[in-house]
């Protein structure tokens, strides 16, 4: 499932990003090993991370393209509801899964290294989709992630 900067244009502002962030559901060390093997077989070099880490980074060996595979997203509970809310989008002729706008907002706010750009990203999604988002779901997930107060502040700023 596409997350991060590449997911943003589907819901908010278009901006450049240096890497591709993908979230994968990996529930066991065995699944992580199988996923890692498949990524390496597809030409990605495992650069960092293990099953217990939030992030496992793989790089395309021939192009230097950086693809980050997130096995535990900040602020998002991996459950059937999260997966059911993802959306199917088109990207370069491919049909891909993209994180829901509500979950994208929560992941941006729950990052331990959250910066000004993350908050700008959240504002852009809110400006574009505020009336069509599931407000109850967004608030519940923000509360679960401990970022509800921050969301309130961002929503109150121009």
Task: Identify what each model region corresponds to.
Residues 1-158:
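Compositionally biased terminal segments of proteins
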């Amino acid at each position: 499932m596409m997350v991060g900067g590449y997911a943003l244009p589907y819901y908010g502002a278009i901006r450049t990003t240096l890497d591709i962030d993908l979230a994968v559901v990996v529930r066991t060390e065995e699944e992580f090993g199988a996923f890692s093997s498949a990524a390496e077989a597809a030409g990605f070099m495992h650069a960092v991370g293990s099953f217990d880490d939030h992030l496992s980074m793989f790089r395309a060996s021939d192009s230097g393209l950086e693809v980050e595979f997130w096995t535990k997203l900040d602020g998002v509970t991996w459950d059937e509801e999260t997966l059911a809310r993802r959306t199917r989008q088109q990207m370069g002729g491919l049909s891909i899964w993209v994180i829901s706008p509500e979950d994208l907002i929560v992941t941006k706010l729950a990052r331990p290294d959250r910066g000004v750009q993350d908050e700008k990203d959240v504002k852009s999604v809110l400006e574009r989709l505020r009336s069509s988002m599931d407000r109850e779901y967004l608030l519940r997930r923000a509360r679960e992630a401990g970022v509800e107060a921050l969301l309130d502040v961002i929503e109150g700023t121009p």
